[in-house]
């Protein structure tokens, strides 16, 4: 039994968070109360802690001891919200790490809770309602008093496994276990198991049954994609997977790995990769090597429905692990994320087309999913250190052909690209005797049965089993594991990893068997060697839980010491759990009970199961012709702009770090006004090359209601038109990932799936494209009982195509931002060829008018021809802007381009309207005069169809002098009849769309943009500080204040470090990181470029005495999330120095040395600010606290470099320029100084607006720092700290927007060159 010390912390909830809770309570009809809150810390130890340790704890936690914990009383109600009893929170793991590294002995664990006090009259039912408001039942408990908190530290006794009596009870015993355990076994699988266990003459253990269920779930084995199909009574010739494989068989060139690893690998290029060299004491060096591109896209739909934050977070984390575990280890690089949900029904912004059909109680509402889910995914990516650069967001919920169609079971998609050494792309054979290792976090009782649960229709499982199946994420420990993997593959041919898998569905019970089965081996495991963070888990829970942030891998015994040294340096847990055998048998030994919870041949677990047969028939949708003649076009335009699929996605984008790693070229935000309209994402392969990688997406699920195969072809087409304006070359260089969602088992849906796969396979082969990777989620149906009524919501067939390609030169990428140049025109290329089909369009959705024919990719040859022309124009720099047509049609394309360029448009659609009318009303067009045609209802309908159809196509901005040549290129490809010159830019802030002299739409662009951003604004208000959301919304149209610009007082192209570089002298710089830091590579690259000799220095190196700061002339503390920022940003890192006497002395000596420089950036800035007591000349320095928005802010912000003592900024003084910010706690706080800012503070960097004025206006000032403070320096200027990230934008190609004159270097290179000059 642990001794538990309670410590009282600071106020937990900000005023606006309290207000939001009170508003939610009022909406539930709860009585008015007063609410206060405070953090409490519970420190568990084997015996009472001495006074000195308690004093250190109080300083560490910013908390106080209490003689007696407070109690509830009449009229004052306590809700003590803690981590869920029986679990250990990620917060506790990291806080306990900090305590250990601060030398605090005897502490078992530190947990944090929040005491919420409600003053007022509440009955028991109302208390329960309040408890539900205050906690997340997935991860938290609500306790009635402080004494109960001791249960956080209760240790349960372990139990052995249980069995199912198949020998005695036969099949019926297994059928019963199937239901009780939520195994989702089919009748064939039950027969298979009964037959095999009877042959083995033994009963199965519960562990073996759970393991079998996970390993053979639809989620893991993709039985439907390998099934036989009988459609309309006829057996089909190929499986779904066979048709996907056909694409690769037809076009294998450029693909290195397909269908046989965690990710696909496609050919990249020989480049110089930058990373620390273990042979040179971790000195950063460039390494020339063949480097390939990893591509992977996953979905995490079921968990996101149940617990949006945790579901989306672990979805992102699982996909990252898939990339990292490819081959013998690789590096994830950039991510994508997408969400599809049912109608949002935002309070105070309910849209006229939204219908609320209700939902089951145990799943989250679409609005809650979109408030919490994106934060979960972004938080994981941010903390791990992967930029998220691409995505989509769609809502749909509507009655169609008698069924409610929608996404109560949402789509949450997570994917990305990575880099891998050519020599690491294939796993090696695991020899007998090889060690089998778990790397990463400990096991705990979460995510039990997730693979099986994800394979079931939502609502068919027991609600408690659904909750058990959701995992929780800890990205900081996944970062540590990735660092271990990086250190291994960076050894090249000496990489100790033989083979590696991520731990996902089924936990170790699926991962370890996969690892050895791939090598045709067996294995013996010791169950009690599995690292655990919970006591009392039984064998099933240990072996099958889906605790995240884990990998399994194999190494030779001779490499164990070297591997251990890598793990210890990175502070990453690992354990040798088993040994490979040559008998094909799987044995899991439990030494605690001297028995074997698992003991069976691998061919029973992963053997050839009875093949699935799917039988279905065609269910044709009802055909209703499209009519829109009586709809006001301007009203339609405004409705379409509010539909989430069309509307601005700011609220999804600015929460995600888009620059970490320093290799981002093109993110979602475009132009000097940072408008979220990019068609694709582009990254660079390295720090001294312009080669890169691109990715785009295509998805058209509403089209599938009308014509599923057409929707599949359109997805492929959209992915191509989205990526077309990147310098890729041959279309065959593009490779696709296909993620398939369907409600299989619902009548007609299996047939649609088959025909769509068939159509996509044929289209890809015709386009010279292949699909080397993909995934499926085929239980996209939600069922529940509402009183006497049985309800269901069935998702349309939903294919998501993600396209990946190597890029020749990232600088040639063309964006939708219109350029304000003289004599330019807009050309529209209509790949719908005038058909203007409206089925599944945004226009139809906002009027509940789901009718018409489906748009389609009718001619793959013409799409190839279009792509070829665009590629030539990109290569020849003939395109000024490019934007493809998709949701919202041509109207959305035009307004989005205008929003990005902040310019007016004068658009004449006369010829395009004529073509659309003639194509669809040939007889009328031949028999009537023009004026008679325009009086018809069919003409009004033609206007709507021309503006809002979503056929493939694109608008390009070109110089007038190039028009003839460009038309000729299209002529050569027989596309000239489908190219229209439609308009020009104007200086007015107006969008004019006309038919000759008749205005169809004439409206103010500011008003249109406010409408476009309304949905994002309202969600932001609900999620973040509403005052900040309102401030950002108010800036729309204020172009002067919100524009980016560059006013530098030096020659950007002059390298002032060159003389020092040429001298050959390279000062050594320590690139300092702590566990959880993720920005070290780009920091080292920037300083290396400026002539420094950069070394990777981990805090563990300093603690162990392997490295000493006295060996360096400069220290750079890097950005990231040290210890996950659990004790305040950078505070745990700083206190591990301040509380460690030897380290304290070492840092103090370094800071006092007049011949050294220090730079702290972001997390490093926060850390160094907390070391102010040992840094000379820092009187008045602030600490950095949570952003005013209470949200992570990732922006390209304007800053000014004022006159200061800073030596590294000396060469930049007086300059104003944009810089990346990415932080959640960047607000300079002067509470330690009574809120006063000292006159001689040493402000080194300030946020400004577009008029070069220091600003407090959000988001121009992204965190609310007073006087716009973004950085400070000490008195003699040797030590400078700043929240922005100059190291991520020292090259011009790293900037989302840059002025024309910046070519290779950006203005921020001067900071690094200035540091080199300052050292002489």
Curated annotation (Swiss-Prot):
InterPro entries: Class_I_gatase-like (IPR029062), FGAR-AT_N (IPR040707), FGAR-AT_PurM_N-like (IPR055181), PurL_large (IPR010073), PurL_linker (IPR041609), PurM-like_C_dom (IPR010918), PurM-like_C_sf (IPR036676), PurM-like_N_sf (IPR036921)
Catalysed reaction equations from the record: N(2)-formyl-N(1)-(5-phospho-beta-D-ribosyl)glycinamide + L-glutamine + ATP + H2O = 2-formamido-N(1)-(5-O-phospho-beta-D-ribosyl)acetamidine + L-glutamate + ADP + phosphate + H(+)
Entries under CDD domains matching the protein: GATase1_FGAR_AT, PurL_repeat1, PurL_repeat2
Single Gene Ontology MF annotation: metal ion binding
SUPFAM superfamilies documented for this protein: Class I glutamine amidotransferase-like (SSF52317), FGAM synthase PurL, linker domain (SSF109736), PurM C-terminal domain-like (SSF56042), PurM N-terminal domain-like (SSF55326), PurS-like (SSF82697)
Gene Ontology cellular component terms for the protein in this record: cytoplasm
Binding site for Mg(2+): 679, 718, 722, 884
SMART domains for the chain: GATase_5
Keywords: ATP-binding, Cytoplasm, Glutamine amidotransferase, Ligase, Magnesium, Metal-binding, Nucleotide-binding, Purine biosynthesis
Coiled coil feature spans: none
Residues binding ATP: 311-322, 678, 886
Gene Ontology terms describing biological process: 'de novo' IMP biosynthetic process; purine nucleotide biosynthetic process
EC number of the protein: 6.3.5.3
Associated pathway: Purine metabolism; IMP biosynthesis via de novo pathway; 5-amino-1-(5-phospho-D-ribosyl)imidazole from N(2)-formyl-N(1)-(5-phospho-D-ribosyl)glycinamide: step 1/2
Location(s), subcellular: Cytoplasm
Record-annotated active site: 1162 (nucleophile), 1285, 1287
Chief place of localization: cytoplasm
Glutamine amidotransferase type-1 domain residues: 1069-1320
HAMAP family associated with the record: PurL_1
Assembly notes: Monomer.
Stated family: In the N-terminal section; belongs to the FGAMS family.
Chain's role: Phosphoribosylformylglycinamidine synthase involved in the purines biosynthetic pathway. Catalyzes the ATP-dependent conversion of formylglycinamide ribonucleotide (FGAR) and glutamine to yield formylglycinamidine ribonucleotide (FGAM) and glutamate.
Identification of the protein by name: Phosphoribosylformylglycinamidine synthase
Species: Neisseria meningitidis serogroup B (strain ATCC BAA-335 / MC58)
Gene: purL
């Amino acid at each position: 039994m642990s001794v538990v010390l309670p410590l009282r912390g600071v106020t937990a909830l900000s005023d606006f968070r309290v207000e939001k809770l009170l508003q939610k309570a009022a909406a539930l009809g709860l009585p008015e109360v007063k609410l206060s809150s405070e953090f409490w810390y519970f420190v568990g130890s084997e015996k009472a802690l001495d006074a000195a340790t308690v004093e250190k704890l109080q300083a560490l936690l910013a908390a106080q001891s209490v003689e007696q914990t407070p109690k509830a009383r009449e009229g004052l109600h306590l809700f003590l919200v803690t981590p869920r009893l029986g679990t250990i929170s990620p917060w506790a793991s990291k806080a306990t790490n900090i305590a250990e590294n601060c030398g605090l002995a005897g502490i078992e664990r530190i947990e944090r809770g929040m005491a919420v006090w409600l003053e007022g009259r509440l009955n028991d039912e109302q208390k329960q309602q309040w408890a539900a408001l205050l906690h997340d039942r997935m991860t938290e408990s609500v306790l009635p008093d402080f004494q109960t908190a001791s249960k956080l530290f209760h240790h349960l006794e372990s139990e052995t496994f249980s069995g199912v009596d198949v020998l005695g009870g036969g099949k019926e015993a297994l059928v019963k276990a199937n239901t009780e355990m939520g195994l989702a076994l089919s009748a064939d699988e039950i027969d298979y198991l009964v037959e095999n266990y009877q042959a083995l003459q033994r009963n199965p253990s519960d562990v073996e049954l759970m393991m079998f269920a996970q390993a053979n779930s639809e989620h893991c084995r993709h039985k439907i994609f390998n099934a036989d199909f009988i459609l309309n009574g006829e057996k089909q010739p190929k499986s779904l997977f066979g048709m996907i494989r056909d694409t690769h068989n037809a076009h294998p060139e450029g693909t290195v790995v397909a269908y046989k690893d965690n990710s696909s690998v496609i050919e990249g290029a020989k480049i110089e990769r930058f990373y620390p060299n273990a042979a040179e004491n971790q000195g950063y060096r460039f390494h020339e090597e063949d480097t390939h591109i990893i591509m992977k896209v996953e979905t995490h739909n079921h968990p996101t429905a149940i617990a949006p934050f945790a579901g989306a977070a672990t979805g992102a984390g699982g996909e990252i692990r898939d990339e990292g575990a490819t081959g013998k280890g690789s590096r994830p690089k950039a991510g994508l994320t997408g969400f599809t949900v049912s109608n949002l029904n935002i309070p105070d912004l309910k849209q006229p087309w939204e219908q609320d059909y209700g939902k089951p109680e145990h799943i989250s509402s679409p609005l809650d999913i979109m408030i919490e889910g994106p934060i979960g995914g972004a938080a994981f990516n941010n903390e791990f250190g992967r930029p998220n650069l691409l995505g989509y967001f769609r809502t749909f919920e509507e009655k169609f052909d008698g069924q409610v169609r929608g996404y109560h079971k949402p789509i949450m998609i997570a994917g990305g690209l990575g880099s891998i050494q050519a020599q690491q792309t294939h796993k090696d054979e695991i020899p007998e005797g090889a060690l089998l290792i778990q790397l990463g976090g400990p096991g705990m009782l979460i995510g039990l049965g997730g693979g099986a649960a994800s394979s079931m229709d939502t609502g068919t499982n027991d609600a408690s089993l659904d909750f058990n199946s959701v995992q929780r994420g800890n990205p900081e420990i996944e970062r540590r594991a990735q660092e271990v993997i990086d250190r291994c593959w960076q050894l090249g041919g000496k990489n100790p990893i033989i083979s590696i898998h991520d731990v996902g569905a089924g936990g170790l019970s699926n991962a370890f068997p996969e690892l050895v089965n791939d090598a045709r081996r067996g294995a013996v495991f010791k169950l009690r060697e599995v690292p655990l963070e919970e006591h009392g888990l039984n064998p099933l829970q240990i072996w099958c839980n889906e605790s995240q942030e884990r990998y399994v891998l194999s190494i030779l015994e001779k490499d164990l010491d070297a591997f251990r040294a890598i793990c210890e340096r990175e502070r990453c847990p690992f354990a040798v759990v088993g040994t490979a055998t040559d008998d094909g048998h799987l044995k899991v030994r439990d030494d605690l009970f001297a028995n074997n919870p698992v003991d069976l041949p691998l061919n029973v677990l992963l053997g050839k199961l009875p093949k699935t047969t799917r039988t279905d028939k065609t269910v044709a949708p009802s055909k209703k012709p499209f009519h829109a003649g009586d709809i006001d076009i301007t009203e339609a335009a405004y409705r379409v702009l509010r539909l989430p699929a069309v509307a601005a996605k700011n609220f999804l984008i600015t929460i995600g770090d888009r620059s970490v790693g320093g290799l981002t070229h093109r993110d979602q935000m475009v132009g000097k006004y940072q408008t979220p309209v990019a068609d694709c994402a582009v990254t660079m392969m390295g720090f001294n090359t312009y080669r890169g990688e691109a990715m785009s997406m295509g998805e058209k699920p509403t089209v599938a209601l009308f014509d599923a195969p057409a929707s599949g072809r359109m997805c492929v087409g959209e992915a191509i038109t989205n990526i077309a304006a990147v310098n890729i070359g041959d279309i065959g260089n593009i490779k696709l990932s296909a993620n398939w969602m369907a409600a299989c088992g619902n009548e007609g849906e299996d047939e649609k799936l088959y025909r769509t796969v068939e159509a996509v396979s044929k289209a890809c082969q015709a386009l010279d494209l292949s699909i080397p990777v993909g995934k499926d989620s085929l239980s996209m149906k939600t069922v529940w009982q509402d009183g006497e009524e049985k309800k269901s919501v069935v998702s349309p067939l939903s294919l998501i195509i993600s396209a990946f390609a190597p890029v020749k030169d990232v600088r040639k990428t063309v964006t939708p931002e219109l350029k304000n140049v003289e004599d330019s025109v807009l050309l529209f290329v209509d790949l719908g060829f005038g058909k203007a089909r409206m089925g599944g369009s945004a226009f139809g959705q906002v009027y509940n008018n789901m009718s018409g024919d489906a748009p389609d990719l009718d001619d793959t040859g013409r799409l190839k021809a279009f792509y070829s022309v665009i590629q030539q124009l990109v290569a020849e720099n003939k395109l000024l802007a490019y934007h493809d047509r998709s949701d919202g049609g041509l109207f959305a394309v035009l307004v989005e381009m205008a929003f990005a360029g902040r310019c007016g448009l004068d658009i004449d659609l006369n010829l395009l309207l004529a073509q659309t009318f003639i194509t669809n009303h040939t007889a009328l067009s031949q028999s009537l005069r023009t004026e008679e045609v325009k009086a018809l209802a069919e003409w009004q309908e033609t206007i709507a169809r021309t503006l809002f159809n979503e056929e493939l196509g694109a608008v390009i901005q070109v110089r007038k002098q190039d028009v003839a040549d460009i038309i000729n290129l299209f002529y050569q490809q027989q596309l000239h009849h489908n190219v229209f010159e439609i308009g020009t830019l104007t200086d007015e802030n107006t969008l004019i769309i006309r038919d000759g002299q008749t205005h169809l739409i004439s409206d103010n662009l500011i008003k249109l943009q406010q409408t476009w951003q309304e949905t994002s604004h309202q969600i932001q208000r609900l999620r973040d500080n509403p005052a900040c959301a309102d401030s950002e919304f108010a800036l729309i149209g204020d172009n002067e204040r919100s524009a980016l610009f560059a006013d530098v007082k030096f020659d950007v192209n002059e390298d002032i470090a060159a003389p020092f570089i040429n001298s050959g002298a390279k000062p050594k710089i320590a690139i300092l990181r702590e566990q959880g830091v993720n920005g070290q590579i780009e920091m080292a690259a920037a300083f290396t470029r400026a002539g420094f000799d950069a070394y990777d220095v981990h805090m563990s190196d300093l603690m162990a005495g392997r490295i000493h700061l006295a060996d360096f002339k400069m220290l750079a503390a890097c950005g990231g999330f040290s210890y996950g920022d659990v004790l305040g940003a950078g505070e745990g890192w700083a206190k591990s120095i301040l509380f460690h006497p030897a380290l304290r002395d070492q840092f103090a000596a370094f800071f006092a040395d007049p011949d050294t420089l220090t730079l702290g950036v972001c997390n490093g800035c926060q850390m160094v600010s907390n070391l102010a007591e040992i840094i000379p000349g820092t009187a008045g320095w602030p600490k950095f606290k949570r952003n005013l928005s209470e949200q992570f802010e990732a922006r390209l912000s304007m800053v000014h470099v004022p006159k200061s003592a800073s030596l590294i900024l000396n060469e930049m003084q007086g300059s104003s320029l944009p810089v990346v910010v990415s932080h959640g706690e960047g607000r300079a706080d002067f509470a330690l100084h009574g809120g006063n800012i000292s006159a001689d503070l040493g402000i080194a960097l300030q946020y400004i607006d577009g008029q070069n004025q220091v600003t407090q206006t959000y988001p121009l000032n992204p965190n609310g720092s007073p006087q716009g403070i973004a950085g400070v320096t000490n008195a003699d200027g040797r030590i400078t700290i700043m929240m922005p990230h100059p190291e991520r934008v020292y090259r011009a190609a790293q900037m989302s927007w840059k002025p024309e004159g910046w070519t290779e270097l950006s203005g921020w290179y001067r900071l690094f060159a200035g540091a080199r000059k300052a050292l002489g």
